[in-house]
C-alpha cells in the first residue's frame, strides 16, 4: 500500500518560508489562509531570568499530515473528505457542504473554510503534480533544501528532492521545473547527514490518526509534542 508523505530535515530548514509562498501561489490559496504554516520553536525564556538560558531553536512546518487513519474522513457526513490509493487525504469540493466537522476533528488545525466557495480546503500534497510524477511545490522550492517527498512504504531513505538545486557552482541558469521529474533527483539517503532512527525521527502528536509526515532533528530537543 502506498503512503505518500513529506520528510523535513529540520537541521537544514532556515525558516525562509519559500514552502509557504510557493504553496499559496500554485494552489491559489486565499489571502489570510495557509495550507503550509511555519512555526519557530524556541528559544525559551525562564521566568526567573531576564534572558533566555535556552537559546536552541528550530523551525517546524505544519500542514495536513495525510494521516494513515484520518479522523477528518471518519466525521465527514458526505464523504467529501476521503483517502486516496496513494495514501493522501483529499476533499471533493462537489460533495463538501462546509459543515467544518473535519476541521474541528483535525488535531493540527490545518483545515479552514473558504468563505467565498463555502467549502473546506487544505494541503493536497500538490496532487496535480504528484499524480503526473512531479514533486510537491513546497519540496521543489525549498530554500534550505530540507524537504523530501516519497512513499513511506519504501522507507524515508528513498524520499526525493531536486538534484540540480543542490549544485554548488550555479553555472546553469536555464533550470526548468520539468527537470525535477524522475531521473534528476537526489534521495534523502544520498544527501542526508547521519541520524539516529530511534531518537531523531519524529512525528507530530498522534491522536489516534497516525500522522504520516516525518521530521528529522539531530542534536536538539524535539518539542513538537508541546
Protein language model regions, located:
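Non-ligating segments of multi-cofactor redox enzymes
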Residues: 1-226
Amino acid at each position: 500500500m502506498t503512503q505518500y508523505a513529506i520528510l523535513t530535515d529540520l537541521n537544514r530548514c532556515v525558516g525562509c518560508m519559500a514552502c509557504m509562498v510557493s504553496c499559496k501561489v500554485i494552489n491559489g490559496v486565499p489571502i489570510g489562509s495557509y495550507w503550509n504554516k511555519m512555526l519557530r520553536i524556541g528559544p525559551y525564556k525562564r521566568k526567573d531570568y531576564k534572558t533566555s538560558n535556552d537559546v536552541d531553536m528550530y523551525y517546524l512546518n505544519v500542514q495536513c499530515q495525510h494521516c494513515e487513519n484520518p479522523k477528518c474522513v471518519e466525521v465527514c457526513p458526505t464523504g467529501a473528505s476521503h483517502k486516496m490509493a496513494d495514501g493522501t487525504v483529499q476533499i471533493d469540493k462537489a460533495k463538501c457542504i462546509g459543515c467544518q466537522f473535519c476541521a474541528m476533528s483535525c488535531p493540527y488545525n490545518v483545515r479552514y473554510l473558504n468563505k467565498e466557495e463555502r467549502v473546506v480546503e487544505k494541503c493536497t500534497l500538490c496532487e496535480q503534480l504528484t499524480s503526473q510524477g512531479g514533486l510537491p511545490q513546497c519540496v521543489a522550492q525549498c530554500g534550505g533544501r530540507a524537504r523530501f517527498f516519497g512513499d513511506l512504504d519504501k522507507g524515508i531513505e528513498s524520499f526525493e528532492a531536486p538534484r540540480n538545486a543542490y549544485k554548488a557552482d550555479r553555472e546553469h541558469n536555464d533550470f526548468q521545473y520539468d527537470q525535477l521529474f524522475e531521473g534528476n533527483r537526489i534521495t534523502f539517503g544520498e544527501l542526508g547527514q547521519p541520524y539516529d532512527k530511534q531518537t531523531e525521527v519524529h512525528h507530530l502528536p498522534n491522536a489516534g490518526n497516525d500522522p504520516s509526515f516525518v521530521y528529522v532533528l539531530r542534536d536538539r530537543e524535539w518539542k513538537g509534542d508541546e
